[in-house]
Amino acid sequence: RSTWRAEARNGRGPAETLARVNRALCQDIHTGAFVTLLYAVLDPETRQLDLSSAGHPLPLLHNDGTVQEIEIYGLPLGLKSDATYQKVHCTLSPGDTLLLYTDGVTESLNLSRELFGLERLIKLVQEHDNCVAAPLIQRVLATARAYSGRAGQADDATVVVLKTCPRTVPSPGHRSSAPRPS
């Protein structure tokens, strides 16, 4: 974590940060051990989003009733010291929902050893597109837990949801140029 914090504060983009953290981890990590993560940097005013992935599940973007995966790939950290990471840049639209999750959600198994899977997750996001972030997170986690039932979850399940405001909201201190009534 210390390496990650130090590198993330240097202001490099997500891809370069992952490459630098990966090189450091490859020197310190046990053979066969690895770390997955997704690094996202958002400019809240412009809704510009830069993403880089180190073996993490693909993020989901819900926009205008459709859910699509943001295709971004990279090796998990700690596997290959000269691994390179790509950066994907996108602009979020007003009302978009970005869902980040660990494989503990989609790889939840029921008693018949069937995966919860990506299709169920996408359907869940579509069905709850009007939810604010916290209830959507709770719904996804509760549904994955319920799917596992008595089998229990074998892996950690984490969900992060980012929802953009449906319309532009002025930033604090922004002054409107509209004339004042006299």
Please give the residue ranges for each predicted region.
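Conserved subregion of the PPM/PP2C metallophosphatase catalytic domain
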Residues: R1-S182
